Amino acid sequence: MTQSVCILGVTGSIGRSTLKILGQHPDKYSVFAVSAHSRISELVEICKQFRPKVVVVPEQKIAELKTLFAQQNISDIDVLAGQEGLVDIASHTDVDIVMAAIVGAAGLLPTLAAVKAGKRVLLANKEALVMSGEIMMQAARDHQALLLPVDSEHNAIFQSLPHNYLQADRTGQPQLGVSKILLTASGGPFLNHSLEQLTHVTPQQACKHPNWSMGQKISVDSATLMNKGLELIEACHLFSISEHFVTVVVHPQSIIHSMVQYVDGSTLAQMGNPDMCTPIAHALAWPERLQTNVPALDLFEYSQLNFQAPDTQKFPALNLARQAMRAGGLAPTILNAANEIAVEAFLMERIGFTSIPQVVEHTLEKLENAAAESIECILDKDKVARSVAQQYISSIGG
């Protein structure tokens, strides 16, 4: 019997990689529902191949989608709109697995809906967990949802931890003999740039990651190291560990995806070629394994693997994220909202590359922190933080 999959963000890089895996295993998985934000022609091609029962697009894209469906004689797929539609498909009774791959804060409500519906949730949307934190983790426990990390680093950590680690007490302290998590970072395309060189970085340059094929937003986050900061916060929540037990290690080759150190002196690492199909397949099938077309790692190709500490003078975003995690409450929501606005402004060439962390720092300083008591207060603070960030960008000429 096949398992039914909902893919939130099907036309993004994670969504496309997920389809690749599902297409290789039609005896195990079927696509029940998908969502897309803007690439409607691509969505139609996906629908022709995988024949989902339901698709969700923004309200303003409904007419375009229905026109293309009519041209292709597609009449057996229901079309829903907006956040309400996303929540509907993520929590649908016919769905077994939800791939949460919508970029940014827009993925929060549907991801939480999937968790509250007790689904197997493959978490590729780190921002949802950065914002909701313990609310999301508590909901997973309350509704017996299985929250499995798809980010290559968190998936590597998950594979390197004791098999029952997620069932351990959530104390903020390492459990079951674990002493530390080593979160690897490629360092991005500007690892060896000077501060002066960073001031001249263009959006086109920032979107070319040396090792991974990714979307624009995560590529820029990777270049500023904010992606690693968001991943640090995500790791703290997923694995119930305080931020001072997480060390970021720059590893330019992206072969070791992360490591876990133990009290007996052991360090376990998960290694593999940099291809998102591997962690996606792992999360889909866990605790089983799926065949993929990803070539096995050939160690003889690599004469050496390099490691270094991150330069937080050149890349202050990492420390901003660590400070936000330490502050707790709504600080990570403020951090994430300001960063999304700053990255968007950079991609539109309204601000320079080095202004991105400045926008984030200003917004964190401007807004008062408070306890993250509910999803409503998180969304309210997200909205305010975006406004403050926009105002600051305008004030510096963006």
UniProtKB/Swiss-Prot annotation:
Binding site for NADPH: 11-14, 125, 127, 215
Binding site for Mn(2+): 151, 153, 231
Keyword field: Isoprene biosynthesis, Manganese, Metal-binding, NADP, Oxidoreductase
InterPro entries: DXP_reductoisomerase, DXP_reductoisomerase_C, DXP_reductoisomerase_N, DXPR_C, DXPR_C_sf, NAD(P)-bd_dom_sf
Annotated catalysed reactions: 2-C-methyl-D-erythritol 4-phosphate + NADP(+) = 1-deoxy-D-xylulose 5-phosphate + NADPH + H(+)
GO terms (BP aspect): isopentenyl diphosphate biosynthetic process, methylerythritol 4-phosphate pathway involved in terpenoid biosynthetic process
E.C. code: 1.1.1.267
A GO molecular-function descriptor: NADPH binding
Cofactor(s) in the UniProt record: Mg(2+); Mn(2+)
Residues annotated to bind 1-deoxy-D-xylulose 5-phosphate: 126, 152-153, 186, 209, 222, 227-228, 231
Pathway: Isoprenoid biosynthesis; isopentenyl diphosphate biosynthesis via DXP pathway; isopentenyl diphosphate from 1-deoxy-D-xylulose 5-phosphate: step 1/6
General function of this protein: Catalyzes the NADPH-dependent rearrangement and reduction of 1-deoxy-D-xylulose-5-phosphate (DXP) to 2-C-methyl-D-erythritol 4-phosphate (MEP).
Family of this protein: Belongs to the DXR family.
Name of this chain's protein: 1-deoxy-D-xylulose 5-phosphate reductoisomerase
Organism encoding this protein: Acinetobacter baumannii (strain ATCC 17978 / DSM 105126 / CIP 53.77 / LMG 1025 / NCDC KC755 / 5377)
